């Protein structure tokens, strides 16, 4: 992968620490690339590395969530090609399947499934289909 020339705003998002962020921009503006780089920088931070499954990344579409996970996998594999004995990166590659990268609906559904007892829902609840929600 060649060197990317990030804009000032993109670099600020990549480097920001100690807070949650919301990245909102037009289609094709590089949101996915910026978020992948931000996550990669955090999991490879020498002073304070985190595990990839400690992030919550929420997108609007299944395609965007899948692309995010695929690109993050590619970024980790690229780094492993340069340093195949990096145990932390090997663990991150394994943890990627546990990463919380999903759509808004999927994220909310997971929260409800996990905490149904606290909000008084039947544990067998299910999300309505598009047709059902139009009724």
Region spans (language model):
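Flexible beta-alpha connector loops of hexameric P-loop NTPases
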Residues: 124-128
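P-loop NTPase Walker
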Residues: 1-120
């Amino acid at each position: 992968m060649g060197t990317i020339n990030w804009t000032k705003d993109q670099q600020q998002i990549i480097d920001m620490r100690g807070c949650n962020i919301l990245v909102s921009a037009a289609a094709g503006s590089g949101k996915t690339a910026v978020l992948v780089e931000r996550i990669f920088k955090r999991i490879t931070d020498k002073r304070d590395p985190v595990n990839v499954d400690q992030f919550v990344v929420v997108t609007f579409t299944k395609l965007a969530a899948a692309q995010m996970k695929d690109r993050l996998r590619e970024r980790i594999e690229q780094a492993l090609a340069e340093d195949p004995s990096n145990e932390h990166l090997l663990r991150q590659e394994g943890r990627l399947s546990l990463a919380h990268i999903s759509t808004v609906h999927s994220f909310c559904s997971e929260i409800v499934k996990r905490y149904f007892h606290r909000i008084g829902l039947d544990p067998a609840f299910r999300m309505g289909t598009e047709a059902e929600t139009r009724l």
